[in-house]
């Protein structure tokens, strides 16, 4: 029987000093035999997805105490990728994932916590906490802050839904007036919560449901809706039950590594492919699997992508559909239900809230449930009132979206497309693979050949796009933006958004060893591995080289002979210390913190995790 970890600091004569300090935090004699649960919050006023979390940690804490545990809250950092976008702030985004994982490990291990509730929401926070949970392998429940309501705006007499990406695209479109840009800007992000499309934050929060580490509705229930409060209340009770099952009954099925097994990772990636999730999820799923010592690789993702259809299209792939619409159609449980009907997921795996995923689907999938409470839960609608307050409205739709032929969520028999929403491409340009979000690619450019326009920074590419130097048919290549080369693997949302602004969203391709925002659409191919800074072929591409992209056949090729590539590689290596670096010095400040990340970062095909030699 495993001993409660916390007893290292709460039991024994020699721990009198530690108990004295615990007492100073409010603990009493009766508390020293209870499980100590870490409430891992990420409140910050910098990020709309986290601005409402301040009081939610204490909400969970009070429920933990009611259930017989001792709750101790701490905070970790949260970077807003949208605010950090387009300048050197983006260098810090991906490295913050490792910092978050480390900070959770530091706090939980230093204080010998027994279990934890992770209150996350945005892009790197959920992945960082997920990595920490699998690294620590103590009972854990995830509950996120929830999605933002979609913006609504009236332009030219027509009401349309919009989000952050629409504001970025409009700002760079010369055909849109300054006044209309202001209207869009003021309407795009109306409430607290993670940005309203199937961007990285919402993708990851949805995947926690498929992994079995969060409650149903975690990925789709709006941050503003009163129904979301139930998830926080239940998380507080559930974590105490999980802790007691593990420490008092020796039940290892309560542990993250037992729940998030290889089969669960396959379920999560199957969901991701079916809903056209952000390409960033590939990085984060690979990183989480690494922390959990799960043998899940790019080859597994490639295998799954060839058999899973697209069952749901959400912004940016479908601009008028947002997370509130996914929720009305039954949320993640409904998508998993359709995948289950098609035999595409493993329904026998445990979750934190049920003995099997199949049991959860039978109760929570609105297409099969007999529970009126479940059906009412998925009627939760946006309030339509700008606010930064959680649980502040209780509006409901008149009816559910149960249409599995033409609705927001489709069946495997009537999918948006038979090919999945993500694909792994390989070829001489990316020997270890690269990723494209096929759900966001127009059918007319699934096969694409064009001349390379080579840039050695995101900034240089943006300047060229806005100066009308990029033409239809070009392949924009942005290199030295990988985990080491950036460092930090910047998101390329501005280049892709500006291509759309210039009317080139369906006429150009973009290939990079950097990554893309979940808000990116178009023929945007990222994570080229090995990256340029590690000797990848992308570092050898020259202006005007022909690049051939074939998504149906999963290939990407630089149309240059092996002999020529060998010659270019030899010439590069001859540069010595200057090899595999940008030819011109870039105007970016790389601090000690960023250099430390770059020194140990692996390429994207390994999840951009750190590799520290023994």
From Swiss-Prot:
State the free-text cofactor note: Binds 1 [2Fe-2S] cluster per subunit. This cluster acts as a Lewis acid cofactor.
Q: Which InterPro entries match?
A: Dihydro-acid_dehy_C (IPR042096), DihydroxyA_deHydtase (IPR004404), DiOHA_6PGluconate_deHydtase_CS (IPR020558), ILV_EDD_C (IPR056740), ILV_EDD_N (IPR000581), IlvD/EDD_N (IPR037237)
Pfam families this protein is in? Answer: ILV_EDD_C, ILVD_EDD_N
So what EC number does this one have? 4.2.1.9
Q: How does it assemble?
A: Homodimer.
Locate the N6-carboxylysine modifications and list their residues: 124
* Annotated active site: 517
| Entry GO terms, CC | cytosol
Pathway field of the UniProt record reads: Amino-acid biosynthesis; L-isoleucine biosynthesis; L-isoleucine from 2-oxobutanoate: step 3/4; Amino-acid biosynthesis; L-valine biosynthesis; L-valine from pyruvate: step 3/4
Report whether Ribonucleoprotein shows up as a keyword of the record: no
Could you say which residues bind Mg(2+) here? Answer: 81, 123-124, 491
Annotated GO biological processes are: isoleucine biosynthetic process; L-valine biosynthetic process
What's the protein here called?
Dihydroxy-acid dehydratase 1
Q: Which cofactor does it need?
A: [2Fe-2S] cluster; Mg(2+)
Protein family according to the UniProt entry: Belongs to the IlvD/Edd family.
- Give binding positions for [2Fe-2S] cluster: 122, 195
- Which GO molecular function entries does the Swiss-Prot or TrEMBL record give? 2 iron, 2 sulfur cluster binding; dihydroxy-acid dehydratase activity; magnesium ion binding
| Chemical reaction(s) catalysed | (2R)-2,3-dihydroxy-3-methylbutanoate = 3-methyl-2-oxobutanoate + H2O; (2R,3R)-2,3-dihydroxy-3-methylpentanoate = (S)-3-methyl-2-oxopentanoate + H2O
Alphabetically sorted, this entry's keywords are:
2Fe-2S, Amino-acid biosynthesis, Branched-chain amino acid biosynthesis, Iron, Iron-sulfur, Lyase, Magnesium, Metal-binding
Species whose genome carries this gene? Mesorhizobium japonicum (strain LMG 29417 / CECT 9101 / MAFF 303099)
Q: What does this protein do?
A: Functions in the biosynthesis of branched-chain amino acids. Catalyzes the dehydration of (2R,3R)-2,3-dihydroxy-3-methylpentanoate (2,3-dihydroxy-3-methylvalerate) into 2-oxo-3-methylpentanoate (2-oxo-3-methylvalerate) and of (2R)-2,3-dihydroxy-3-methylbutanoate (2,3-dihydroxyisovalerate) into 2-oxo-3-methylbutanoate (2-oxoisovalerate), the penultimate precursor to L-isoleucine and L-valine, respectively.
């Amino acid at each position: 029987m495993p001993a409660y970890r916390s007893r290292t600091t709460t039991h024994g004569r020699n721990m009198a000093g530690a108990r004295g300090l615990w007492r100073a935090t409010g603990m009493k004699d009766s508390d020293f035999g209870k499980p100590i649960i870490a409430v891992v919050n990420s409140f910050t006023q910098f990020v709309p997805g986290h601005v409402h979390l301040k009081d939610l940690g204490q909400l969970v804490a009070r429920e933990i105490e009611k259930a017989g545990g001792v709750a101790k809250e701490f905070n970790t950092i949260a970077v807003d990728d949208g605010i950090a976008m387009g300048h050197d702030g983006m260098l810090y985004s991906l490295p913050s994932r490792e910092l978050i994982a480390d900070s959770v490990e530091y706090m939980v291990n230093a204080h010998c916590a027994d279990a934890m509730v992770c209150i996350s929401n945005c892009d790197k926070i959920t992945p960082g906490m997920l990595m920490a949970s699998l690294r620590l392998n103590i009972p854990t429940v995830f509950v996120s802050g929830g999605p933002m309501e979609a913006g609504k705006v009236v332009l030219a007499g027509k009401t349309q839904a919009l989000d952050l990406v629409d504001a970025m695209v409009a700002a760079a479109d010369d055909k849109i007036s300054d006044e209309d840009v202001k209207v869009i800007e003021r309407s795009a992000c109306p409430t607290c919560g993670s940005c309203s499309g199937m961007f990285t934050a919402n993708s990851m929060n949805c995947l926690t449901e498929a992994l079995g580490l969060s409650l149903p509705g975690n990925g789709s229930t709006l941050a503003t809706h009163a129904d979301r409060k139930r998830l926080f209340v239940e998380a507080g009770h559930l974590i105490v039950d999980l802790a007691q099952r593990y420490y008092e009954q020796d039940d290892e099925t309560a542990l993250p590594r037992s729940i998030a097994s290889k089969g669960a990772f396959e379920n999560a990636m199957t969901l991701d492919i079916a809903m056209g999730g952000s390409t960033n999820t590939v990085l984060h799923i690979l990183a989480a699997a690494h922390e959990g010592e799960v043998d899940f690789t790019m080859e597994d993702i490639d295998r799954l992508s060839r058999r899973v259809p697209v069952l749901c299209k959400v912004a940016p792939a479908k601009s008028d559909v947002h997370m509130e619409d996914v929720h009305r159609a039954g949320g993640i449980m409904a998508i998993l239900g359709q995948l289950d009907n098609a035999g595409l997921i493993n329904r026998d795996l445990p979750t934190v809230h049920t003995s099997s995923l199949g049991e959860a689907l039978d109760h929570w999938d609105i297409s099969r449930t007999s529970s009126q409470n479940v059906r009412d839960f998925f009627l939760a609608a946006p309030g339509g009132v700008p606010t930064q307050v959680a649980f502040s409205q209780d509006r409901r739709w008149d009816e559910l979206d149960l249409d599995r032929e033409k609705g927001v969520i489709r069946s495997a028999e009537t999918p948006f497309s038979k090919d999945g929403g993500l694909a792994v491409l390989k070829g001489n340009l990316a020997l270890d693979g690269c990723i494209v979000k096929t759900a966001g690619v127009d059918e007319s450019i699934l096969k694409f050949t064009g001349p390379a326009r080579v840039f050695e920074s995101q900034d240089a590419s943006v300047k060229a796009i806005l100066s009308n130097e990029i033409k239809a048919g070009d392949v924009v290549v942005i290199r030295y933006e990988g985990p080491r080369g950036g460092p930090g693997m910047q998101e390329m949302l501005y280049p892709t958004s500006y291509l759309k602004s210039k009317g080139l969203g369906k006429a150009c391709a973009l290939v990079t060893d950097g990554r893309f925002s979940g808000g990116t659409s178009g023929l945007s191919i990222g994570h080229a591995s090995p990256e340029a800074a590690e000797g990848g072929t992308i570092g050898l591409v020259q202006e005007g080289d022909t690049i051939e992209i074939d998504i149906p056949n999963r290939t990407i090729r630089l149309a240059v002979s092996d002999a020529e590539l060998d010659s270019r590689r030899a010439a590069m290596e001859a540069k010595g210390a200057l090899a595999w670096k940008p030819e011109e010095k870039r105007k970016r400040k790389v601090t000690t913190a960023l250099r430390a990340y770059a020194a140990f970062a692996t390429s994207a095909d390994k999840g951009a995790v750190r590799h520290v030699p023994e």
